[in-house]
Amino acid sequence: MLFFSGGTALKETARVLARRVNTTHIITTFDSGGSTAALREVMDIPAMGDIRSRILALADTSSDRVRRLVSALEFRLPQDPSAAISVFRDYVQGRHPRMLLLADEDRLWLMRGLAAVEDRLSAKFRFEDASVGNLVLAAEYFALGNRLQPAAQKMCALVQARGAVHAVSEDLAHLAVRLENGKTIIGQHRFTGKTGRVVPSPIADIWLVRDRAGRQVSVQAEPSALGAISRAALLCYPVGSFFSSIAANLLVGGVGRAVAAAQCPKVFIPNPGADPELRGHTLVSQVEFLLRLLRADSPGERAENLVGHILVDTENTHYSGGIPREWLEKNRIGILDRPFVNPTDPPFIPGEKLAKVLEELAISKG
């Protein structure tokens, strides 16, 4: 199974599936918020926080060595600036309690990586709440010739990730959107709604820019990501932030053509809960958006060859605008209605439930 993803919505499902089937994750590299933003402000690098998060979600923590390494990589520095710098120094010198638990080779790898990235950080860098995993991945990025995919592969190997993680692109870019009211917003963190800034008008368009000055740019897919798409037994546009996590992957040159050429089922799982990015959008408009982005790279492609099915749970949730059965039938897009949503108790989508449905789907459509 291959997922176009980013963010945390699929994290638990990915962790469950990793124990049972082979999964591949194509992850966006255009975010501009949180710990990623602090790094991108002082270094010319792609966003790597979502890649780090997915790699660690796939780690084989049945091993004590890996479990301790994952704990060290998941650690975030304190939010107090002086405490953050002090703890960072403890990490660099290998004396932090989490570092002392590591195997010698893992501790040395972390110490060298953090020391190397420290040399590249400007005085403007904010250490508070920084992700240790992001800092180490940035160090590997520079050590491997400014290449994110080899850095991700190295981290995958060290944590014995059960599955593959691919950066959708090595190119540097940020996300920009235009709202229906005509306003343009540059930067994923400014429109995703995760910090309370919900877009005041529906998102009408999305594209990539080189920087926050707004220069539009075309980027190309990382070759290994295209290869993974061509080999997939099932392609999935999963739950998650629709524009910044799912649609963002489809803006990249080569992805639409690879999806069209892939000889496998292609399934869209719309968000059953509220997604701040989807204000004013219905299920039809979401599918139309996916098709528009994919057809920009593969013009004239039939809808069913890009989005063959939608997976919904009408028993436990409601979808904005309802299920457009006639429209879907007209476009030869199938409806798969399965129970996988927990309507009352968290998590809203239990990873075990969705994983089971996807496994059954892969078998039935394979």
Residue ranges of predicted features:
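Conserved catalytic alpha/beta core of Sir2/sirtuin-type deacylases, generalized to analogous enzyme cores
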Residues: 1, 8-15, 22-25, 34-36, ...
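Generic detector of intrinsically disordered, low-complexity, polar/charged segments
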Residues: 3-4, 130
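Electropositive, gly/pro-rich neighborhoods at or near active sites that engage anionic ligands
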Residues: 30-202, 363
